[in-house]
Amino acid sequence: MAWVWVDKGMLLLLHDESLAEHGGDSRLRDEGLLDSVLMRPENLAAYEQPDFAALAASYCVGLAKNHPFVDGNKRAALLATGLFLLLNGKKLTASQADATLAILGVAGSEISELEFAAWVRRNSKDR
């Protein structure tokens, strides 16, 4: 499949909008980390045959654990997950509460990347 990747500019815009609504410092802590996070799924696709959920999980884990932003990394992780799914014909079906718990689990190392990918499979559908 020809995947549509999350664009850095799109993610930065969504991150800024989220922080404008919910509060926080919108600065980028480390642009190199952000670039690295955004390349994780592409590298995964180049060397393996992941499905949409594994690629979405790669974005999520990278953002939630590498902290490229000063604030809002978990929110950015969820935004990138949802954006990747939408760009590739899927959408999240989980409630906001369930999605928040899942992201907190990823950020706290209670949910692995494989487990989050399984969660995405269970909580998404075709658009």
Each model region followed by its residue ranges:
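FIC/Doc superfamily catalytic core
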Residues: 1-127
